[in-house]
Amino acid sequence: MALKYVSSYLLAVAAGNENPSVDDLKKILDAVGSDVDEECLQGLVDSMSGKTVHETIAAGMTKLQSMPAGGAAMPAAAAGGAPAAAEDKAEAKKPEAEPEEEEDDMGFSLFD
């Protein structure tokens, strides 16, 4: 289902129509010049019948909160010395001296 159909449904509800019909949604989509798939609109209207938008959003938020976020936990590495050695090498490198401002001029002058 395309987001434009859900958006048109939410727009109709925000305008005060608590139970928009397929024709109401088609009018909204036609006003912006969008193509309309009537089967998709009918499926949306059927799935939202008897429910309010606020109840549907609250149910979705509850489902999202119950999902784990961040993926699975990684197992601890067996050899813990490898990352420390990499950090030592990074610290051993000295940052190169940044070029002077005059060297970066490349012949361009702001006031020429």
Swiss-Prot record:
Keyword terms, alphabetized: Phosphoprotein, Ribonucleoprotein, Ribosomal protein
Post-translational modification: Phosphorylated.
Organism superkingdom: Eukaryota
Biased composition (Basic and acidic residues): 86-97
Positions of the UniProt region annotated as Disordered: 69-112
InterPro entries hit by this protein: P1/P2_N_sf, Ribosomal_P1/P2, Ribosomal_P2
Pfam families per the UniProt record, alphabetical: Ribosomal_60s
Protein name: Large ribosomal subunit protein P2
Function comment: Plays an important role in the elongation step of protein synthesis.
Record organism: Babesia bovis
A cellular component annotation (GO) from this entry: cytosolic large ribosomal subunit
A single MF term (Gene Ontology): structural constituent of ribosome
Subunit comment: P1 and P2 exist as dimers at the large ribosomal subunit.
Record family assignment: Belongs to the eukaryotic ribosomal protein P1/P2 family.
BP-aspect Gene Ontology terms: cytoplasmic translational elongation
Biased composition (Low complexity): 69-85
